[in-house]
Amino acid sequence: MDLSEYGINNVTDVIRNPSFEVLFEEETKPGLEGYEKGIVTELGAVSVDTGIFTGRSPKDKFIVKDDTTRDTLWWADQGKNDNKAIDQKVWNELKVLVTKQLSGKRLFVVDGYCGTNPDTRLCIRVITEVAWQAHFVKNMFIRPTEEELASFKPDFVVMNGAKCTNEKWEEQGLNSENFTVFNLTEKMQLIGGTWYGGEMKKGMFAMMNYFLPLQGIASMHCSANMGENGDVAVFFGLSGTGKTTLSTDPKRALIGDDEHGWDDNGVFNFEGGCYAKTINLSKEAEPDIYNAIRRDALLENVTVRADGAIDFDDNSKTENTRVSYPIYHIENIVKPVSKGGHANKVIFLSADAFGVLPPVSKLTPAQTKYHFLSGFTAKLAGTERGITEPTPTFSACFGNAFLTLHPTQYAEVLVKRMEAAGAEAYLVNTGWNGTGKRISIQDTRAIIDAILNGSIDNAETKEMPIFNLEVPTSLPGVNPEILDPRDTYTDPLQWESKAQDLATRFINNFEKYTDTTEGAELVAAGPQLD
């Protein structure tokens, strides 16, 4: 295979689209050292160490500003995001660096699809010198058939030079000697200095987030599943809100756990695998994910003892321990292709640590746009004296880190798709209330059931002040005392004080959208203070 068209020369050998069997042998063979080395665990899955980068490095992400992107991309100087600009000259220098690193080596080339829809999918080619990175790509992207591989033509190329270091970073105006950079004219991603596999996965998600909405297709950071009658639900939510847990439901088949599109035919997965967190994983609490960790799965940054036993509770390396596996490692999935019809339920998950939001409320179309653009969740951060103060996070479209267009473009496309399908939106709080405890998973699952089986639409409701949300007064299987968060406080004035605090944060965050007529009009759909 000739890789000279990419600037890679004198390659000693190319292992093209290796099988899982070949990858297992390559990543565990004797003589491998450092971060290239895979360890076989007692569950049969290989475990690797990704070095100092145990997560994405958003500060090292840059995109070439040229005629393609200048007027379409949502740049870092236009809003709080990671889309920092570089010029063609810096790109050329980084490309030389990566191609030099890969030239003269034995390389792995993996071809795959991003997106199950043949009309809009990206044909991805990843070139790397590290076997386990090739394995990660094979797990996470959609695996073409032998027939498809025979005529495969990439329309996006990822060159992963994890072993190279950029010593000229300061004069180039970059953040460090590591880089993850994109060129949308050349349709290429270059990676240098970081070994973290997620840079390839989320890099392609950012590209789908650019190309699809410009074609009127929703591109979503969400999980999706399908009921026995073919009804589809999508779950938006930031990390820790329950996106994976709640969409993995024995009564429903999984379409995907993280990245989806919504076009004229319905909802479709971008990926061929899952990338699950494994910190504190147990067979009892999450049997589906635990049972997916077997041969062909790839663990990252977990602690493996000498006998191959895995300590899932050990966070000494990172809280962000992960496993990637092909989607068919989950038993109850939509087959043969990870796609469904149009969604009729859209669920926004928020873990509110302020104890203000109701466990569930049905949203109007204007509220849907408002809460989608706000993308709110909150965490409890412990302080030295044991006092816990909630930390709010507002992440536009529940995926700010991966947006390449202005957030309003995603909201517009999503709402159009929802209106055409007659879909309803719901805000579900999986966080805390006035009792100081987190809303139980049993109550949250019963709420999700009520949304999916339609019983919530027949429930009596009342309006909650300040946030003006419509709240049901009773739902099957849900403790009625929690449905109005005010009832969980001994003194309702406590709720009101917290609600005013949170409302102020929502209002301040939304100010960035009020420079347009539509954004200014949406203010009325958010919380109101007298």
Swiss-Prot record:
Residue numbers binding Mn(2+): K202, H221, D258
Principal cellular location given in the protein's record: cytoplasm
Coiled-coil intervals, chain numbering: none
Binding residues annotated for substrate, in chain numbering: R56, Y196, K202, R322
Top EC class of this enzyme: lyase
Residues given in the record as ATP binding sites: 202, 221, 237-245, 286, 322, 438-439, 444
Entries under CDD domains matching the protein: PEPCK_ATP (cd00484)
GO terms of biological process kind: gluconeogenesis
UniProt keyword annotations, A-Z: ATP-binding, Cytoplasm, Decarboxylase, Gluconeogenesis, Lyase, Manganese, Metal-binding, Nucleotide-binding
Pathway the protein acts in: Carbohydrate biosynthesis; gluconeogenesis
Annotated catalysed reactions: oxaloacetate + ATP = phosphoenolpyruvate + ADP + CO2
Co-factor binding details: Binds 1 Mn(2+) ion per subunit.
Required co-factors: Mn(2+)
Intracellular or extracellular location(s): Cytoplasm
Alphabetized SUPFAM superfamilies for the sequence: PEP carboxykinase N-terminal domain, PEP carboxykinase-like
Gene3D superfamilies named in the record: 3.90.228.20, Phosphoenolpyruvate Carboxykinase, domain 1, Phosphoenolpyruvate Carboxykinase, domain 2
Keyword Acyltransferase set for record: no
EC number: 4.1.1.49
Subunit note: Monomer.
Record-stated family: Belongs to the phosphoenolpyruvate carboxykinase (ATP) family.
Function: Involved in the gluconeogenesis. Catalyzes the conversion of oxaloacetate (OAA) to phosphoenolpyruvate (PEP) through direct phosphoryl transfer between the nucleoside triphosphate and OAA.
Name this protein carries in UniProt: Phosphoenolpyruvate carboxykinase (ATP)
Gene this chain is encoded by: pckA
